[in-house]
Design a protein with these regions (language model features):
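General marker for long, soluble alpha-helical cores
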Residues: 1-177
Length: 177
């Protein structure tokens, strides 16, 4: 199907695509999907999309993803997201990330998270981050993390904080460590 034909598929009909059909889509076809079509895709069908094609989704398409779709993405799909795509994620979708998905975020993706997205991470998500992911956060990001989440940092995670990050901690965050 051409990009125009893909874009012309009724939103209600997108649900009828099989996982195999989604997996076989070209990058051009994926980019032609409307935001309504993306939002209407079954979570398991989106999971079948290749990581390369996930990286080709526009930021508006990323914003259209549902929490169920995000929670069902593979760790390879999560790692394929560009930093612009990560920044575009709705905070509810950041909260929907599984611990495996959160742990799969690259250091570049971690550095791309907005303050609101970091605040949306759950204590469990924060507590399972790798030390390298913590070290990748900017000072501004560190200061945006909720005090309860700072308290959940492991000794290894806390030791990964750089001097600039430690300097950015608030008094309540320091007390929580």
């Amino acid at each position: 199907l051409s990009s125009d034909q893909i874009a012309a598929i009724e939103t209600a009909d997108i649900k009828h695509l099989t996982s195999g059909q989604v997996a076989a889509m070209t990058s051009d076809q994926v980019q032609a999907l409307t935001t309504d079509q993306v939002a209407a895709m079954e979570a398991l069908d989106l999971r079948a999309m290749t990581s390369v094609n996930v990286s080709k989704l526009g930021t508006d398409q990323i914003q259209a993803l549902t929490t169920a779709q995000v929670a069902n993405m593979t760790t390879a799909q999560i790692q394929a997201l560009t930093t612009d795509q990560v920044t575009a994620m709705d905070t509810a979708n950041v909260t929907a990330l599984t611990t495996a998905q959160t742990m799969a975020l690259t250091n570049g993706q971690m550095a791309a998270l907005t303050s609101d997205q970091l605040q949306a991470l759950t204590t469990l998500q924060i507590s399972t981050l790798k030390a390298t992911q913590i070290a990748a956060l900017t000072s501004e990001q560190i200061s945006a993390i909720e005090t309860a989440d700072i308290k959940a940092l492991t000794a290894v995670q806390a030791a990964a904080l750089g001097s600039d990050q430690v300097a950015a901690l608030t008094t309540s965050q320091i007390a929580a460590l």
